[in-house]
């Protein structure tokens, strides 16, 4: 199982998510890196940045309050990017955004994907961050984004997205999946968990994104 980061923040019950990650690692072979959301938490242990409820950082503050010492210790063990070699298959390079930029967004930044693939010394690049499922090839290299389980940007909404990679004849063949799930139950958890009291406007953007598949959260952040 390959995981590309952004495991918690901006959602209810982050401690439950962490427990599921620990269980997954016990039961399966996992290759994991961390994303920008984990960076935010690691950089603010003890709330050095002064995050507050009912502010632009409210949901981050909520998550920070629910993190345990073992969660921070676990995040510290995860690299921001790494290569992955599986016998008989081409080398994969894993990153959250782009190599060297955990917040590099090939879906929003014009020309970034082309630049990254041109310079990439690996045949395959797996990236996340944009939450947008896609595959593209150029310069003899391939970029794959499996999408997002918890916050898919697909202009449809109410789906969890991921990809299955199959090694075939010295190449990787991805199958992209988009699975409907109980979004209404998830939305109720925002209220039941208390996170809605922390996030305010951003939480409304997140919940609208979950229903529509449009990244209102990203555009809300840009507007702040």
Predicted regions mapped to residue ranges:
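Metallo-beta-lactamase
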Residues: 55-91
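Acidic, His/Gly-rich catalytic cores of divalent-metal-dependent hydrolytic chemistry
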Residues: 138-224
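Active-site environment of divalent metal-dependent phosphoester hydrolases
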Residues: 9-12, 37-42, 100, 126-137, ...
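Active-site neighborhood of phospho(di)ester-bond hydrolases with catalytic His/Asp-centered motifs
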Residues: 1-6, 31-36, 94-95, 124-131, ...
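Active-site-proximal segments of metal-dependent phosphoesterases and phosphodiesterases across multiple
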Residues: 50-54, 88-120
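Anionic-ligand binding region
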Residues: 110-149, 160
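Core catalytic region of metal-dependent phosphoesterases/phosphodiesterases
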Residues: 1-69
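Conserved hydrophobic/aromatic beta-strand scaffold that supports enzyme active sites
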Residues: 81-83, 94, 135, 162-164
């Amino acid at each position: 199982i390959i995981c590309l980061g952004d495991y918690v923040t901006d959602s209810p019950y982050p401690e439950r998510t962490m427990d599921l990650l620990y269980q997954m690692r016990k039961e399966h072979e996992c290759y994991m890196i961390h994303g920008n959301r984990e960076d935010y938490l690691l950089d603010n242990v003890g709330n050095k940045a002064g995050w507050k409820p009912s502010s632009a950082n409210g949901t981050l503050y909520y998550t920070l309050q629910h993190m345990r010492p073992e969660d921070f210790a676990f995040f510290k063990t995860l690299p921001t990017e790494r290569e992955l070699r599986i016998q008989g298959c081409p080398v994969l390079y894993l990153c959250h955004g782009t190599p060297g930029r955990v917040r590099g967004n090939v879906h929003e930044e014009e020309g970034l994907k082309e630049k990254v693939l041109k310079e990439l010394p690996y045949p395959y690049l797996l990236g996340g961050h944009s939450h947008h499922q896609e595959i593209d090839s150029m310069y003899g290299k391939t970029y794959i984004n499996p999408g997002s389980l918890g916050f898919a940007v697909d202009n449809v909404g109410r789906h969890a997205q991921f990809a299955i990679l199959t090694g075939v004849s010295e190449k990787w063949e991805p199958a992209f999946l988009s699975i409907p799930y109980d979004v209404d139950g998830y939305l109720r958890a925002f209220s039941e968990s208390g996170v809605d009291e922390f996030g305010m406007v951003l939480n409304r953007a997140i919940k609208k994104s979950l229903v529509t598949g449009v990244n209102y959260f990203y555009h809300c952040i840009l507007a702040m």
